[in-house]
Amino acid sequence: MRYTEVIDRLYVGSCPLVPKDIKELKKMGITAVMNLQTDADMLYWRIDWDKMTRTYEKSDIKVYRYPIRDEKLEEGISLLDSILAEEHKVYLHCNAGLNRSPTMAVGYLVKKMRISRHDAARLIMSRYYCEPYLDIIRL
């Protein structure tokens, strides 16, 4: 996995593929995971979701699935906001952590910090190599 903390308590990165990755998240102090992968993504990456869910539960990490391709940001941003409002340390991921999860993080910053999508993207990209889809952020 590759990841970084983009703002306090919010990490963006690539998908955990095996239970060992979840144990790494636990060591980092992650208390919640927001997974943006679709069922097709899981199939492609051969992720055993049942096994991963059990490992999250054993690790005392809450997991939220919000499967999206590259739109429907607003509902996802609200979910992310509610998870962070519960004081969780959140790991937000899609597949490679290059597009969807950084886009969601940018959208969250636009909504919460009331900054432009370009400023939000610059902030995240200064900490983490990614290519957020700025053209779909219309908040």
Question: What label would you give each PLM region?
Answer:
Residues 7-89, 112-138:
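Cysteine-based protein phosphatase catalytic domain of the PTP/DSP
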Residues 106-112:
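Walker A/P-loop NTP-binding motif
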Residues 88-106:
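A phosphate-binding catalytic loop at a beta-strand-loop-alpha-helix junction
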